[in-house]
């Protein structure tokens, strides 16, 4: 690439703390862009509850179209108690499902890292959790959440778990490709001792692995995997699983760092990637400059990975770690005897340290 690389970002601040945490993510993107020779242009669009209030739709057509025309989508958070009684397509969260469908994404990436500086914040023993670095690769469009038939019957209810060979194969390829960039180990999680769908899952994943002999593969039943995530999380590198099991396991692992404010996510595989923090809109602290922007900033790092700016993505992660190592803590992480860093102050620290982690005119890798 030349020195005129540029990326158009569809910025969806959303509700609650979404605007303030993604604002810091954009600050960091601009800082590392200057250091790595690319520019970022972010254009704001409405989504979620704020879009409902203004347009009557949680995902206006104009927002959807802008996302499809962008290089990446950065989302803050959607929803809140104001819209808690809404149903169907009048729920703010329905806009997120519609956006994922429009973008065609099928792979959800959920990194869970416990930086050494924050090991004491974990509910687990620091010597067991410190240094944890797991990437959950969750299939996002199939499984029991979308299988048919489903619904209430005269005497009960039914849900259907279903996967096709192709759906399993494509998500397995994502997991093996990501493992090659990391430590080269994939743990595939299923329930093949009970479920026929899981038997197929294990068979197809094993077949895909035949084409990736440089990556190590092991299989775990989901109940054992849940125990192992708590017992020894550092054993995992990439965890590959279906929609239901991935939903549960990634939320279980989300407790390891000690704050949802540290957890980013990406939904990829379609025309454009969607990047968002795992946490919700937290309306009770919105607008107070106290929210932790780390998850949004690390989501921006995933965005950079996806568009090929891997050195800049690593610089962002280094900036977060450096700020934490220097003792900067937002309110959710600060000890009683520590001074809190505001949302904006923490974002500035990360931006400065991320930009300074490489020479100003570093060559493109």
From Swiss-Prot:
Record's keyword annotation contains Transport: no
Coiled-coil parts of chain: none
The reaction(s) this protein catalyses: (2R,3S)-3-isopropylmalate + NAD(+) = 4-methyl-2-oxopentanoate + CO2 + NADH
Pfam families reported for this sequence: Iso_dh (PF00180)
GO cellular component: cytosol
Site residues, Important for catalysis: 145, 191
One example GO MF annotation: NAD binding
Region (Disordered): 337-365
Subcellular location, record wording: Cytoplasm
Binding residues for NAD(+): 80-93, 280-292
Gene Ontology BP, a term: L-leucine biosynthetic process
Binding site residues for Mg(2+): 223, 247, 251
This protein's pathway: Amino-acid biosynthesis; L-leucine biosynthesis; L-leucine from 3-methyl-2-oxobutanoate: step 3/4
Cofactor comment: Binds 1 Mg(2+) or Mn(2+) ion per subunit.
Keyword Transmembrane helix on entry: no
Record text on subunit structure and interactions: Homodimer.
Family: Belongs to the isocitrate and isopropylmalate dehydrogenases family. LeuB type 1 subfamily.
Protein role: Catalyzes the oxidation of 3-carboxy-2-hydroxy-4-methylpentanoate (3-isopropylmalate) to 3-carboxy-4-methyl-2-oxopentanoate. The product decarboxylates to 4-methyl-2 oxopentanoate.
Protein name: 3-isopropylmalate dehydrogenase
